[in-house]
Amino acid sequence: MARALSVTEAVSMKKETLKLTGAWADAFGEPERIGVWFIWGNSGNGKSSFVMQLCKELAKFGRVAYDSLEEGASLTMQNTLRRFNMAEVNRRFQLLDCEPMSELGERMDKHKSPDFYVIDSFQY
């Protein structure tokens, strides 16, 4: 069993963060580089558009893999990539075409795998 941390020890620990810019910094501050974010909303409320813009921001800090489980590499996805000018982050953004979770896990285990993974959308 690991030793419990004192308050002083806990608050003095250095964490790697994302220095987000503009509206992203205004909304989320400087989040820790690791973690899980859930974006929820009703169908048609702009979740995929929001997440695509988030991917573009995350690409400033590393490589992003976007697993589009609903749209894949469809015309709709092509239009979304164009609308948000994702070509600007071409070398730091990968579109995964409906990659199953088992294969995604294998991808994550590979050497030099992307730094961030986005799954759109996860059925619960």
Task: Provide a role label for each language-model segment.
Residues 15-31:
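Pre-Walker A adenine-sensing motif
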Residues 33-103:
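Conserved P-loop
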Residues 110-124:
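Conserved P-loop NTPase "ATPase switch" module shared by AAA+ and STAND
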Residues 30-37, 113-116:
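Short, basic/glycine-rich phosphate-binding loops at helix/coil junctions
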Residues 1-14:
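Charged, amphipathic alpha-helical linker segments immediately N-terminal to NTP-binding catalytic cores
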